[in-house]
Each structure stands twice: as C-alpha cells, then as structure tokens.
Amino acid sequence: MASKQPAILNPTPEDISLLLAAQTHIGTKNCEKAMLPYVHKRRADGIHLINIGKTWEKLVFAARVLAAVENPADICVISSRTYGHRAVHKFAANTGATAIAGRFTPGSFTNYITRSFKEPRVIVVTDPRVDHQAIRESAYVNIPVIALCDTDAPLRHVDIAIPGNNKGRHSIGLLWWLLCREFLRLRGIVPRTPNGWNVMVDMFFYRDPEEIEREQAEAALAKQAAAANAMQESTIEQVDFAIEGAGAGGVNPSVAANLPAGGEQVDWSADAAQDWAADTGAAPAASSWD
C-alpha cells in the first residue's frame, strides 16, 4: 500500500481485519462526485466499495489535526445519528473533548445568548447529512470540520473527510475507536504497541436501551433467586424422627390402666352412666331480681 505517511503510522494487519469485519468498506449505491477518489470499485449489485487505504490515511490525518489542538475541550464531537451517541461519549470520556449526542441545538455556534453556546477549535461529525446544522454553523464562524463520510455524503463545508460506512453501528463505533486511539498515541498518552490501550472497541458500539434493561432485569432476578436459595438452605433444620431409648414404641401406663381387660372392645355408642339432665337436688341460687 503506497502511502506518504511515516511507516510508524501505517496500519497493522489487525487494523485492516477490524475495518473489513466491521464492513467499513461497504458504501451505498449512490456516490457523490467528490467521493469518487475514495471509491475502490462498484460491485455488480451497485454497491460502491471504499478504499480502506484511503480510510486509514485520512483517519491518521484527522488524528494529527486533533492532536495539534492544545486543549482537548476545544474539540467538539457531534452525532445526531443514534448509532454514534455512545461512540462520541466514549471519545469525549477518553480524550477530554466535548460531546454533543442527539439533537444539535441551532445557534450553538453562532448565537452567544443560548445556554448551549460553544466556541470550539474544531468539530468532528458522524454524518454530514444528519449533522448538517452543525456543519453550516461551523462554516459561518470558520470552524474546521472533520466528518465520517459515506459514498453518498455531501462534502460541502467539510475540510477533512474520513471515507467509511457511517450507517452501521459497528463501523461507526470502530472508526471513532480508531480515531480516539490514534489521538491518544500521538499525544503520547498510550504507547504505540498492540496492547498499549486496554479499552475494547466494543465499548464504542451502540447498544439498544431495551436490551440493556432486559439484561439488568435478568441479572436482578438471578441475584434474588440465589439469595432466596441461600436463605432457604440456612433456615431449614434437619428434623430427626428416630426415637431412641426405653420409651420407643411404648404405651403410657396410665392410659393402659383404663382400658378394658381381656381385649374387649369399647362401645362408644352406649348410654352414659350418668344422666346429665337429672335434678341434682341443689337449691337454686338466690336472685336479686325478686
């Protein structure tokens, strides 16, 4: 791969494998004229394939521009696309940049009266089509724009275009992860070794909130079930029904004395020996009502 950048900045086979696995090279059926230099070829089904070598060159170039900014807080990373929300937050957490995820408030770069007013040195957007408001305002106030651009992305007011698939969640997360890693390497924060940065690329991938809630609910139920089982095992006592000693299988002597001799059966239907309704001859009790 012919490149004008230093050999130390060349991609490793692992980096190329990640880009291909995340389908970063898969474009769209539409292709802007300005994006033609970044297209490798067009497939039979009409899908344009992006040159991975160009993607890496522009990625390193963008990282060198960001590393030149003295204060990382002056870098504003923006993503109105849902798949890029987590990626920009992770990028900001690892670099100290300012993240804007979700709807971009109009006037954030031009109207100083708004609460969200910012004056960044450079901005990085996920998709020029979706983040067009931020790009337009940056053009008004002369803020350089770095953008992840698919084959159908308009490059108007975009200063540095990083060609790549900006519609898949894996591709978006990987591009932001590579940009963050290269930024930290150029800053000297992490070494340029295969295991120099211990943050996995999965941390930059978008996750469905419902999936996260489902996993948390399942974990809570499993924890409650484990606690209930532990409590039940600790409270159950083993009862010994075996009776040992002289009294085992014996009969109470006082009860046996009242039983009829000779094994006669007791007639429980016989009349009682005493008439409970008979007059006992006792004088009636005196009453105070008389």
Swiss-Prot record:
PROSITE patterns: RIBOSOMAL_S2_1, RIBOSOMAL_S2_2. It is found in: Cytoplasm. InterPro entries: Ribosomal_uS2, Ribosomal_uS2_C, Ribosomal_uS2_CS, Ribosomal_uS2_euk, Ribosomal_uS2_euk/arc, Ribosomal_uS2_flav_dom_sf. GO terms for biological process: ribosomal small subunit assembly; translation. GO terms for cellular component: cytosolic small ribosomal subunit. The keyword Zinc-finger does not apply. Keywords: Cytoplasm, Ribonucleoprotein, Ribosomal protein. Residues 268-290 are annotated as: Disordered. GO terms for molecular function: structural constituent of ribosome. Pfam families: 40S_SA_C, Ribosomal_S2. NCBIfam families: uS2_euk_arch. Belongs to the universal ribosomal protein uS2 family. Required for the assembly and/or stability of the 40S ribosomal subunit. Required for the processing of the 20S rRNA-precursor to mature 18S rRNA in a late step of the maturation of 40S ribosomal subunits. Component of the small ribosomal subunit. Mature ribosomes consist of a small (40S) and a large (60S) subunit. The 40S subunit contains about 33 different proteins and 1 molecule of RNA (18S). The 60S subunit contains about 49 different proteins and 3 molecules of RNA (25S, 5.8S and 5S). Interacts with RPS21. This is Small ribosomal subunit protein uS2. It comes from Malassezia globosa (strain ATCC MYA-4612 / CBS 7966). The gene is RPS0.
